[in-house]
């Protein structure tokens, strides 16, 4: 029979086999009855693909993977041949033939199991373990095959529910992360029993399918890294798998937003990787500026939005804000019943309902804590997050109150609004939205993942207490002052663990400690050992330098606290870590297989239950390797006979084929089972050995099960010391951040600022923009002289040519303020800085099409928010207010807004950039230099050619006075606009100026004529105006 015809026979056989003769592994895709309509299956290929022996094994024909013996299927092949279609094996249905509906047939046990699982989990993609592969069935298989670029297999099965794609079980987490990155929720279904355990314990009928359960559910934000693949080289040598997601610079938050009313909001955010919980309540308007600020900090990948009972959908402004922050964000809508306007009884009922749900996941003490300390809208967020995270086994995140923080703790931190974060490019630049050129990129010299995470919090929330700021400045000075071998040693240690996220590993232990399912632990054994061994190493290092630490002359209380706490722990609590490590057998490090790591992780004498299983294994090994082997030697008359192991089959005996005939009667009489035959030898196993081998395999399975149970208990004991471990890691993170700021502060020409708490002084000599100077070494420095001690220079009106450096100057002022209060030195010769509690910036032309707002509307909304939120310690920067509308309206609004800020009772510090020359009159309206006009310096070079614009040279330095010309035509020339267009624009510009001057002359002539006619009746003020006009015109000529 030809190869093609033989393959056609097999292919036909797979589709027509009776249920009683089928195997589990002949399955393909599954689509539940509630799934959307499926596309038609792809036409079969013109030639059937070959099915080598490896492919048959994949389908389960090896007798070890939920399958019947291959011999059974072979005996039926002739019957299948008779039922073959008369059509050729490679042909498909003709175009004229009608598609046939799949024949109704009884489903195999595995098919039924797959359908039941997918019916129960229609909201997720299921990766189902079958043998040594994970398979995806139905329409989900089509999605996954495209994501992973793997084969989508139909095998000519008409029922598309059983078309599938598959991945090796050893590559589960690698492929899982790729699927999650596309926004899907994924469930992992594992076989939770083995064939041998099933046979020995007889837990179910022998014909039943293997038990399978969903052991883990994941999304992009709830996946905490490679939790079980201990056979990955990177998880040990590179230390990088401790938290694959933690390596990202942007934390992945899950946020719950409660729309209590149109203007009142509550929010709770969780970061599962490190167990952080952030809450807040705030008022907002239709622009959702406050919500946008919080979302920019959190950058959520999953959002739950709770709306009140009267609203059936998320409000438009909220939805648009979410999409603008992250258009790939997964948004879940929940209907709630916020009780902002309810009466007392309604509040009590709501509170009781929330407590009833929370009590299912938290103990009574914690439920009471949440009920007492948080408002009902915040409690509702906690409630929905508990319900949501329960599916992912992450409710433990709410069991550590110390990890819960308030977003806007105004007593300790300055909260930078969304516009400020974007305009100052704090975390990302405005060009390609990467970290290049951002302030965080400049400051982030951390050596560890958890240190970088903490520094991000420091940058996003500058300090407002002068003593806290001085402590960080002093720490930098102490670290800079002289070489310290202790500091250098700890710094080297942090460099060594740069890929190991100790904070993330500790959170994984916390989640796993209450997870009773050993198939879904969040952390593996190598990661546990790495955590403990590195914590021990740093404490031993501190012990080694005990005398040096005690003799430190640090002035910084922050550094003193770090070393004192580490030294105390090294003296009193290191024994706890040592006790845990004493239970671990270090030989497991060299094990490659995860089952071998499991067996060898603990020392045998650490747990009686493990030792008992080893004794059982030794008993059956002795039966096979000594007693049974002796019997075999006597029966076969070979005293030197030894067992061999081939292809994973243990305890085989080999007999050469030329001796097989002599021993055939003994082999038959003594129950020797033929295992495999080759051209030269035949391998057997004695039936009694097979029985003992089953018992041996059973106890080996029991050993793994017992080791897993003891590992679970081990994690619970570790979690009971969570506070101790967290204190060590937190101190290391703070030290890492201080080293990072020290590195930046050690750049050339950086200096420590002098702090003043009494007023909003900003006095800086030769200030430089911190990020631009890294990109442009020839950056022009400027002095900053803002001293409002006597209410002088409180408002700066800045004019000047386009591209003259106005925006760069005001951004420098703001960035130096932020850097000061983060605790970093400044790029300047010297500086005296006041302490601000807020920085507001309105800069740039930003329309918002999705929100339906024009540039001018966004401008006015942002100005309104600034006016409503400013304080007596605010720095306000406004850039070209009023340019989004007509000139008259723009000037009027710019003048009025600035005048309001000048006269406000809060007296904020204001930097006002404008191209409206008439605004400069405010300097004359307010005496004592309260308002001062400045402009960016330039040099104009006259062009003698008629009709040609003058050339200008930008000097980029700040000068006193006002400039009336913005030199926009010069910018157009730099941009490459056609010379003819620029010449035409220059002629129009000159004509407009001439017309304006002519009108002013006519006005002057009219006033002069009137004065002459009236003789001496003219008022002194009127005559003064005429004199002033004549003098001004004369000086201009």
Curated annotation (Swiss-Prot):
Q: Where is the composition biased (Low complexity)?
A: 66-75, 86-96
Please list the residues that bind ATP: 800-807
Q: Which residues form a coiled coil?
A: none
Mispair-binding domain as annotated region, ranges: 102-221
Q: Which GO terms describe its molecular function?
A: ATP binding; ATP-dependent DNA damage sensor activity; double-stranded DNA binding; mismatched DNA binding
> What would be one Gene Ontology cellular-component term for the protein?
nucleus
Q: Which UniProt keywords apply?
A: ATP-binding, DNA damage, DNA repair, DNA-binding, Nucleotide-binding, Nucleus
Q: How does it assemble?
A: Heterodimer consisting of MSH2-MSH3 (MutS beta). Forms a ternary complex with MutL alpha (MLH1-PMS1).
Q: What does this protein do?
A: Component of the post-replicative DNA mismatch repair system (MMR). Heterodimerizes with MSH2 to form MutS beta, which binds to DNA mismatches thereby initiating DNA repair. MSH3 provides substrate-binding and substrate specificity to the complex. When bound, the MutS beta heterodimer bends the DNA helix and shields approximately 20 base pairs. Acts mainly to repair insertion-deletion loops (IDLs) from 2 to 13 nucleotides in size, but can also repair base-base and single insertion-deletion mismatches that occur during replication.
The family classification in the record reads:
Belongs to the DNA mismatch repair MutS family. MSH3 subfamily.
Mind telling me what this protein is named? DNA mismatch repair protein MSH3
